[in-house]
Amino acid sequence: MKFDVLTLFPELFNTVMGESIIGRAQKNRLVEVNAVNIRDYSKDKHKKVDDYPFGGGNGMVMMCQPVIDAYKAISEGMEQKPKVIYMSPQGKVLTQEMAKELSKQEHLILLCGHYEGIDERIIEEIIDEEISIGDYVLTGGELPAMVLIDCVSRLIPGVLSTEGSFSDESHFNGLLEYPQYTRPADYNGNKVPEVLLSGHHANIEKWRMQQSLDRTRDKRPDLFNKLPNKNLL
């Protein structure tokens, strides 16, 4: 899967996305993250990419020309237009279900806003969907884009060692993940639950499911209330 990221700070992606699981996925050619510097497409002699908002107001707004020209440079000659996502606080909040759907795409283009936002005509011309990672404000769209890339890439076959690596995680099946333990079995008198040491796999699975249900009910009642047949759980 290919991610083209339109950004003013490509070096952030070259550093962070080259490490850990995503870095390995790129080396194995399962994922490609290509950071495109919007400033390279500015026709201004000073490579300016922003200007004052019409009607007044604080801050600067990213201009149409550099952004749309950067997009055209990526998509030119393609038979099928890639899905273009604007990382925006006004978008739908990213969920695991959304990530599953996005992982079915072969190519995504992510636009990272900055300053006070982008010219509305960019959204009208090239954006298919706006996505947020939460109801709060960040300096730019780079961190949200990295979150989306990480979340989606984990669902691509081969990126993780086994499917179980993500199918047991929090949110994958609508539940929070059960507690995890490692050695030693007794740390300063705080012991690992006996069932995990028993070797009885059916009992372990039953314990884990109950723990997931309890955690979801206690920590995220909003998720628990969405579960089907929750009254029978």
Curated annotation (Swiss-Prot):
It comes from the Bacteria. Homodimer. HAMAP family: TrmD. One of its GO terms (cellular component) is cytosol. Pfam families: tRNA_m1G_MT. InterPro entries: Alpha/beta_knot_MTases, tRNA_m1G_MeTrfase_C_sf, tRNA_m1G_MeTrfase_TrmD, tRNA_m1G_MTases_N, tRNA_MeTrfase_TRMD/TRM10. The gene is trmD. S-adenosyl-L-methionine binds at residues 113, 133-138. GO terms for molecular function: tRNA (guanine(37)-N1)-methyltransferase activity. Its EC number is 2.1.1.228. GO terms for biological process: tRNA N1-guanine methylation. Specifically methylates guanosine-37 in various tRNAs. It comes from Ruminiclostridium cellulolyticum (strain ATCC 35319 / DSM 5812 / JCM 6584 / H10). It catalyses: guanosine(37) in tRNA + S-adenosyl-L-methionine = N(1)-methylguanosine(37) in tRNA + S-adenosyl-L-homocysteine + H(+). Gene3D superfamilies: 3.40.1280.10, tRNA(m1g37)methyltransferase, domain 2. It is found in: Cytoplasm. Keywords: Cytoplasm, Methyltransferase, S-adenosyl-L-methionine, Transferase, tRNA processing. Belongs to the RNA methyltransferase TrmD family. This is tRNA (guanine-N(1)-)-methyltransferase.
